[in-house]
Amino acid sequence: MTIRTGRAALVAAAAIASLTAGTSLLAHGNVTPQAVDTSALPDIEGGNDNWIAENPYTGNAKAIAIGESAYGQNCARCHGLEAISGGIAPDLRYLELGPSGDEWFVERFRNGSSHDGKVYMPPFGEVLGQKAGWAIRAWLETKYTDE
């Protein structure tokens, strides 16, 4: 392989990597929600229509397992594996524990986030429901760090 051919291959590889990264950035907020089986979890008073203010599944091992799976299917694409963000979306390990963190989580989970007509996070509340949302939050609580 000549230097010229090697250099051309390197430039082509860099161009492909740039296009792939750009496509990933544009895809942010364009997520098709994946169903979450929450039938093993206790029902929440109010169902999906009347969201409660605090996580009823904190520390519930079954909810944490369901939440981990649901996060991997629906959240990791933007927020990163194990809730460690690559910098595009908030790193959810730093989401406060307790009522203030619950409030922030529910607002974003239910309604998503958009600014100036750009969708940064689609709403998941109606599609996945309250039980799945709180299960994801229960799992996120196990990843909390203040460092």
Regions found by a protein language model. Give the residues of each.
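Axial heme c-ligation environment in periplasmic c-type cytochrome domains
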Residues: 27-36, 86-94, 111-144
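Bacterial N-terminal signal peptides that target proteins for export
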Residues: 2-12
